[in-house]
């Protein structure tokens, strides 16, 4: 058998080399086209650029979590992350306006890379609980981005305690200094308690600080009104310096509203002399001065012969008669003992003559107190509402002199006619598991538990204590009041707490 010469094998090897060269060239062209397409995609404005170092790490993390169904479904929606980042960024820029200057292209790329690098399993877990306690001008933008995707853009509205740390941590960025930024925000009407830092520790501090302060000023992250209130809310006031209140004319002082920004601290003592002879106890109101001295202000006692509870209030501790010159006002209840009205020493319109009605000496209603009935006997503190006349532009009390039952403070309040009146209510106590009781923070002014202890606030500002009252001994109570109450109003409200209320206990 003859074999082919060696030269016959040469053409076959040449053909193999040419075929492999063609395949290699084809692969090179395909690779070049693919690189061009990827380069074009990277240059598109809506594309989030991923960090090259973080891409393999994200892929490995994704592969390790494919077995978890929650993470897998979470990753399935990550395709729209780039649009969500751009939309949230645009919303935040609209909210902040001119307070944030345009960053250079390199800064935008790094921000986009960081956002895309957080798409992996492990980084996303670390950021899962962020921005829990934030509130401020851009809160709506953050809520919208949270509803659409997991990517967070800004951290706006941190507490004042975290603001300095946030500005220090963000000092190396392309943002303006803290003073320039605060000045710009004040010109634009934006709250100064703002930080653009996104460090994990700062977010945790902001969240914990918000939880600690949740019992002071609650705000809704989805309410535009609460955002405006949070932006315009003043910073917590410093402890007020001790001020000695001078009392020249007792009657004038008892009817004058407390000065704004000053808490008038008083003490009520209960004298039970004569109770063995069927008399009611006498209550004395004294002003607590900073030097330790006590100044008498008012005295009150319940009348014996009266269909309803009727407390007479006088500026003379020895003369508690209605016909005396020291009589300044009274507190009267309804038959159930659940509603009380405070009057001055004017004339009752039902007993007044026509000349008296026109002379302006009709009695003035100074306050009304309504206790919520508790006929089912639920355990817990009393619930009360206090209605007082409003204040005019010069901080004087509006005179309310009703001529019939339809013009009284209680009737206006029940008919939702809130013109020229102020509605207050007691602050809801917090249940303490350790002491198994309801507690309120009286700042050391109340030391004994009692169902009579209360704090009066306004619904729009629960931190401003208009009045507080509580027991410090068996027959000694403290009573502190602020603007817009006067001494007579506060003392009468406290007397209503002493009265027995069978339908409220």
Swiss-Prot record:
Acidic residues compositional bias, start-end: 196-205
Gene Ontology biological-process entries: intraciliary transport; phagocytosis, recognition; photoreceptor cell maintenance; positive regulation of phagocytosis; protein localization to cilium; protein localization to photoreceptor outer segment; receptor localization to non-motile cilium; regulation of G protein-coupled receptor signaling pathway
Main function: Functions in signal transduction from heterotrimeric G protein-coupled receptors. Binds to membranes containing phosphatidylinositol 4,5-bisphosphate. Can bind DNA (in vitro). May contribute to the regulation of transcription in the nucleus. Could be involved in the hypothalamic regulation of body weight. Contribute to stimulation of phagocytosis of apoptotic retinal pigment epithelium (RPE) cells and macrophages.
Its membrane topology: Peripheral membrane protein
Gene that specifies this protein: Tub
Classification via SUPFAM superfamilies: Tubby C-terminal domain-like (SSF54518)
Cross-referenced PANTHER family: TUBBY PROTEIN HOMOLOG, TUBBY-RELATED
Keyword terms of this UniProt record: Cell membrane, Cytoplasm, Membrane, Nucleus, Obesity, Phagocytosis, Secreted, Sensory transduction
Keyword Nucleus: yes
Claim: S-adenosyl-L-methionine is one of the keywords in the record: no
Coiled coil: none
Main location: cytoplasm
Gene Ontology molecular function terms on file: G protein-coupled receptor binding; intraciliary transport particle A binding; protein-containing complex binding
Organism encoding this protein: Mus musculus
Disease named in the record: Defects in Tub are the cause of maturity-onset obesity, insulin resistance and sensory deficits.
Compositional bias of kind Low complexity: 70-87, 206-220
Quaternary data: Interacts with GNAQ. Interacts with TULP1.
Protein name: Tubby protein
UniProt-annotated stretches for the region Disordered: 35-243
């Amino acid at each position: 058998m003859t074999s082919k010469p060696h030269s016959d094998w040469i053409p076959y090897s040449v053909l193999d080399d040419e075929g492999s060269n063609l395949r290699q060239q084809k692969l090179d062209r395909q690779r070049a086209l693919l690189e061009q397409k990827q380069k074009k995609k990277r240059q598109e404005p809506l594309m989030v650029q991923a960090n090259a170092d973080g891409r393999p790490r994200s892929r490995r993390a994704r592969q390790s979590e494919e077995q978890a169904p929650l993470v897998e479904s979470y990753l399935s929606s990550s395709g729209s992350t780039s649009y969500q980042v751009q939309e949230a960024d645009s919303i935040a820029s609209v909210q902040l306006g001119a307070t944030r200057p345009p960053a250079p292209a390199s800064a935008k790329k790094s921000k986009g890379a960081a956002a895309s690098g957080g798409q992996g399993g492990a980084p996303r877990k670390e950021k899962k609980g962020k921005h829990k306690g934030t509130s401020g001008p851009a809160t709506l933008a953050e809520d919208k981005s949270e509803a659409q995707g997991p990517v967070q853009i800004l951290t706006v509205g941190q507490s004042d305690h975290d603001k300095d740390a946030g500005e220090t941590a963000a000092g190396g960025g392309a943002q303006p200094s803290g003073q320039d930024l605060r000045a710009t925000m004040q010109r634009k009407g934006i709250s100064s308690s703002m930080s653009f830092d996104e460090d994990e520790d700062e977010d945790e501090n902001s969240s914990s600080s918000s939880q600690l302060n949740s019992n002071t000023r609650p705000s809704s992250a989805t309410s535009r009104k609460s955002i405006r209130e949070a932006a315009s809310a003043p910073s917590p006031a410093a402890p007020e310096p001790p001020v000695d209140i001078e009392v020249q004319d007792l009657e004038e002082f008892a009817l004058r509203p407390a000065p704004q920004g000053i808490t008038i601290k008083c003490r009520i003592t209960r004298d039970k002399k004569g109770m063995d002879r069927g008399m009611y106890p006498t209550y004395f109101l004294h002003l607590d001065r900073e030097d330790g001295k006590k100044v008498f202000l008012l005295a009150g006692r319940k009348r014996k012969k009266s269909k309803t509870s009727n407390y007479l209030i006088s500026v003379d501790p020895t003369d508690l008669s209605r016909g005396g010159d020291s009589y300044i006002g009274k507190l009267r209840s309804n038959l159930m003992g659940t509603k009380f009205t405070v009057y001055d020493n004017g004339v009752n319109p039902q007993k007044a003559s026509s000349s008296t009605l026109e002379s302006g000496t009709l009695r003035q209603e100074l306050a009304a107190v309504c206790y919520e009935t508790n006929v089912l006997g639920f355990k817990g503190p009393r619930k009360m509402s206090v209605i007082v006349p409003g204040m005019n532009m010069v901080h004087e009390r509006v005179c309310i002199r009703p001529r019939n039952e339809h013009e009284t403070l209680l009737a206006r309040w029940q008919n939702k006619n809130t013109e020229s009146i102020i509605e207050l209510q007691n602050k809801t106590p917090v249940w303490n598991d350790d002491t198994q009781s309801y507690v309120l923070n009286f700042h050391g002014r109340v030391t004994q538990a009692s169902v009579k202890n209360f704090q009066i606030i306004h619904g729009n500002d629960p931190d401003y204590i208009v009045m507080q009252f509580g027991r410090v001994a068996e027959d000694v109570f403290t009573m502190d009041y602020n603007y817009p109450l006067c001494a007579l109003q506060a003392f009468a409200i406290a007397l209503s707490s002493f009265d027995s209320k069978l339908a409220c206990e």
